[in-house]
């Protein structure tokens, strides 16, 4: 097979690709976007008497009770919310619907 003639098609393609690479973008490198930050929640780590009374009054009447719901309504952290759910369950005020590995879904006991 004889050698290819200089200035073949592949050389032209490579030259056009190199030109396209050099002139793309115009603005240079893309900048990193600023990450959105949420405000820090100052949730309680212990129940005081008023909050505990509110827990015993409000939570057994809720339709859906999860760790997140208790934490949001009572303004307590997640571990305290899990303990509160365990206590309500042991007192028979709520019943379990779904049991997961880390969390569960509960509802009012009628």
Swiss-Prot record:
Gene3D superfamilies: 3.30.63.20. InterPro entries: Ribosomal_eS25. It comes from the Eukaryota. One of its GO terms (cellular component) is cytosolic small ribosomal subunit. Residues 1-39 are annotated as: Disordered. GO terms for molecular function: RNA binding; structural constituent of ribosome. It holds the Pfam family Ribosomal_S25. This is Small ribosomal subunit protein eS25. Transmembrane segments: none annotated. The keyword Ribosomal protein applies. PANTHER family: 40S RIBOSOMAL PROTEIN S25 (PTHR12850). Keywords: Ribonucleoprotein, Ribosomal protein. Belongs to the eukaryotic ribosomal protein eS25 family.
């Amino acid at each position: 097979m004889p050698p290819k003639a200089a200035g073949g098609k592949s050389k032209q393609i490579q030259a056009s690709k190199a030109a396209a690479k050099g002139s793309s973008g115009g603005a240079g490198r893309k900048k990193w976007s600023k990450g959105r930050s949420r405000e820090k929640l100052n949730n309680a780590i212990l129940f005081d008497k008023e909050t505990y009374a509110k827990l015993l009054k409000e939570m057994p009447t809720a339709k859906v009770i999860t760790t997140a719901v208790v934490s949001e309504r009572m303004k307590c952290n997640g571990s305290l919310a899990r303990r509160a759910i365990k206590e309500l369950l042991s007192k028979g005020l709520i019943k379990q619907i779904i049991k997961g590995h880390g969390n569960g879904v509960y509802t009012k006991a009628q």
